[in-house]
Amino acid sequence: MPKDILEIGKKDLEYYLQGIGTKNKFFSDSAYAILEESWLLGEGYKSYRKWLNLGGLGKWKNNWDCDNLAVSFKLYLQMLHAKHNPYTFTDRWKKKVENMTNVESVAVGVVYYKIERKGSSSMHAINMAFCPQGYAFTPEGNFHTLKRLYIEPEDGTVKKLTKKEEASIWYANF
């Protein structure tokens, strides 16, 4: 996991979800770690694929398809986050130890959207992640800006969703 981790609260994460079609947005935690794009698509994704291969799930199947891949990529990143931040509140207080971050989760979710092609349509599940993009300097203060990434969990590539596809997102879970 990266050394310097930005954090974002649920309300701020909701702000960055503006423009997607769904009202079905679910947040299971109150704060999230923002992962660097280069780590997420590089080392993070490569180690995820190794983990899948160890379990014999390295290839797409009818019963191991897009939704399973998207959920498992999110889960894998959450497992790494928990492993690298092992101390509970009690541990930190009694043993005087620190985690890299104390947020509950990573800012990688699962989204479902509609794909329309020449007279047919289907649903597809991918991952949505928020990564650092730069800085904004305002009278209210300086802050990091984030960018929304859509990741195809089958091959680890960034997908460019059209406005219509973003508007068709019917479920998002972080």
PLM feature segments, named:
Residues M1-F174:
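A structural boundary/capping signal
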